[in-house]
């Protein structure tokens, strides 16, 4: 709901989202902003595999005011899929699981990931971040995940564009960072 609805529509609650983008396109910031918004609807686990809890990640947490949702937003690092399954089997586990990024998962097969995670937890929403190489999701598993997800978002120039099933306006976008987007599209 709110400012993202024109770009993303109203996805169903137990949906899988795929978010990709080139390096320095605003993808990680967008994924974290989405996680913050999802805290309005339930608990969020942010599985930070690509960055861990490095300095840029910590700065982003501070810059985006994630302390405002500290009770609902949990950052976890270094998990295997088996660890994540064990975590999600616990009572009062996260309603929303963000994995950033899928290229760092210890599972390399989409079929296995679907069986071990998605099929096992049909009442959880999964938001899956992915790297891009030459305009495509990097790796076969990322490409398969993209195909499977109902919401597909591509970040470019600090804007997030929905390519999924829930928006009627293919030109609509969500601005991740006003100043960065203005500079990017002014020089494009």
Model-predicted segments: where are they?
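Conserved catalytic network of the ASCE P-loop NTPase/AAA+ motor domain
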Residues: 11, 37-40, 68, 88-92, ...
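Alpha-helical scaffold elements adjacent to nucleotide-binding pockets in ATP/GTP-utilizing enzyme cores
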Residues: 56-60, 112-116, 144-148
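Pre-Walker A adenine-sensing motif
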Residues: 1-11
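Phosphate-binding/switch loop-helix module in NTP-utilizing enzymes
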Residues: 75-129
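Active-site-adjacent loop/helix micro-motif of nuclease/hydrolase catalytic cores
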Residues: 26-30, 105-112, 137-138
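Phosphate-binding/switch region of NTP-binding enzymes
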Residues: 119-188
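Conserved P-loop
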Residues: 12-82
């Amino acid at each position: 709901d709110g400012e993202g609805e024109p770009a993303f529509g109203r996805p169903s609650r137990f949906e899988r989202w795929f978010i990709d983008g080139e390096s320095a396109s605003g993808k990680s910031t967008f994924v974290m902003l989405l996680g913050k918004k999802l805290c309005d609807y339930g608990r969020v686990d942010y599985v930070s595999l690509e960055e861990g809890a490095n300095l840029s990640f910590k700065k982003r947490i501070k810059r985006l005011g994630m302390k405002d949702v500290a009770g609902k937003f949990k950052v976890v690092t270094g998990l295997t899929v088996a660890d994540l399954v064990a975590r999600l089997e616990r009572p009062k586990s996260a309603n929303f699981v963000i994995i950033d990024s899928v290229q760092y998962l210890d599972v390399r097969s989409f079929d296995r990931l679907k069986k071990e995670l998605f099929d096992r937890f049909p009442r959880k929403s999964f938001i899956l971040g992915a790297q891009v190489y030459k305009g495509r999701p990097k790796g076969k598993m990322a490409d398969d995940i993209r195909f499977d997800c109902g919401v597909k978002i591509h970040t470019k120039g600090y804007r997030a564009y929905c390519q999924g099933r829930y928006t009627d306006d293919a030109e609509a976008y969500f601005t991740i960072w006003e100043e960065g987007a203005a500079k990017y599209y002014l020089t494009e």
